[in-house]
């Protein structure tokens, strides 16, 4: 007979009512991480973790689904308000912010923290299709 493995049920922690939503949007993927003000991760989701593969991970729709999933999980743990920090040049930036708002999180601040070089590294060569 196969022995049953005993698993501890995931404990739902009650978090602070305010937090920070970090949206990292690259050309290939979008990662949404919701943390407390002190920086402890409450929930996260990414386009790839949801099940999108290849070029579909970089789409605005994939970013929307990822943001909805992360915000629902954070709200189930007691979060109500969030600041939004957006990072990166990807297509899913605005869509992810709208999805957080539509899911019911009250957004208090939107800040773009994309690093801009003072003429640093040479950019990749232009694509010839």
From Swiss-Prot:
It comes from Rhodomonas salina (Cryptomonas salina). This is Small ribosomal subunit protein uS11c. Keywords: Chloroplast, Plastid, Ribonucleoprotein, Ribosomal protein, RNA-binding, rRNA-binding. InterPro entries: Ribosomal_uS11, Ribosomal_uS11_bac-type, Ribosomal_uS11_CS, Ribosomal_uS11_sf. Transmembrane segments: none annotated. NCBIfam families: PRK05309.1, uS11_bact. Part of the 30S ribosomal subunit. One of its GO terms (biological process) is translation. One of its GO terms (molecular function) is rRNA binding. Its main location: plastid. The gene is rps11. It holds the Pfam family Ribosomal_S11. Belongs to the universal ribosomal protein uS11 family. It comes from the Eukaryota. Disulfide bonds: none annotated. It is found in: Plastid, Chloroplast. The keyword Ribosomal protein applies. One of its GO terms (cellular component) is ribosome.
């Amino acid at each position: 007979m196969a022995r049953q493995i005993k698993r501890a049920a995931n404990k739902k922690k009650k978090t602070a009512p305010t937090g920070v939503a970090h949206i990292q949007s690259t050309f290939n993927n979008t990662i949404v991480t919701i943390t407390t003000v002190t920086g402890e991760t409450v929930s996260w989701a990414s386009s790839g973790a949801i099940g999108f593969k290849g070029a579909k991970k970089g789409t605005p729709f994939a970013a929307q689904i990822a943001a909805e999933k992360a915000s629902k999980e954070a709200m189930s743990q007691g979060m109500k308000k969030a600041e939004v920090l957006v990072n990166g040049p990807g297509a899913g930036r605005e869509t992810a912010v709208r999805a957080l708002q539509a899911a019911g999180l009250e957004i208090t601040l939107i800040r773009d923290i994309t690093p801009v070089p003072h003429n640093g590294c040479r950019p990749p060569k232009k694509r010839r299709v």
